[in-house]
């Protein structure tokens, strides 16, 4: 089980990214638009830099929904390999069958 503080920190980052996502996208569009004057693009860049650092999507870490483990994460199921094995052995994931040959 991961530390509760690191899981909560990641959840706060997710909320900030959702909150500031449209504003960040609008500012980035202004910055990348070559037809805009340089001063306007520079002001947009300063506004983007003034936003909270944790509002960037890149700072979000994929974590297991069951254990909070940050590594060996299966995106499709949102669980780690260890939780996947436990849930699969208990028959809680539909369609997952233990292999035998």
Swiss-Prot record:
Key words of the record: Ribonucleoprotein, Ribosomal protein, RNA-binding, rRNA-binding
Pfam families assigned to the protein according to its UniProt record, in alphabetical order: Ribosomal_S14 (PF00253)
Record-linked PROSITE patterns: RIBOSOMAL_S14
GO molecular function terms listed in the Swiss-Prot or TrEMBL record: rRNA binding; structural constituent of ribosome
Top-rank taxon, per record: Bacteria
Record keyword ATP-binding present: no
Gene Ontology cellular-component terms listed: cytoplasm; small ribosomal subunit
Disordered as annotated region, ranges: 1-21
Function statement: Binds 16S rRNA, required for the assembly of 30S particles and may also be responsible for determining the conformation of the 16S rRNA at the A site.
Family: Belongs to the universal ribosomal protein uS14 family.
PANTHER family: 30S RIBOSOMAL PROTEIN S14, SMALL RIBOSOMAL SUBUNIT PROTEIN US14M
Name the record gives this protein: Small ribosomal subunit protein uS14
Originating organism: Mesorhizobium japonicum (strain LMG 29417 / CECT 9101 / MAFF 303099)
Lineage: Bacteria, Pseudomonadati, Pseudomonadota, Alphaproteobacteria, Hyphomicrobiales
């Amino acid at each position: 089980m991961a530390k509760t503080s690191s899981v909560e920190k990641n959840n706060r980052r997710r909320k900030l990214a959702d909150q500031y996502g449209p504003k960040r996208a609008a500012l980035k569009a202004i910055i990348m638009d070559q037809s805009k004057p340089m001063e306007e693009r520079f002001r947009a860049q300063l506004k983007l830099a003034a936003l909270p650092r944790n509002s960037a999507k890149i700072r979000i870490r994929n974590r297991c929904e069951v254990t909070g483990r940050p590594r060996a994460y299966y995106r499709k199921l949102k669980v780690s390999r260890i939780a996947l094995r436990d849930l699969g052995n208990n028959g809680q994931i539909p369609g997952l069958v233990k292999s035998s040959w």
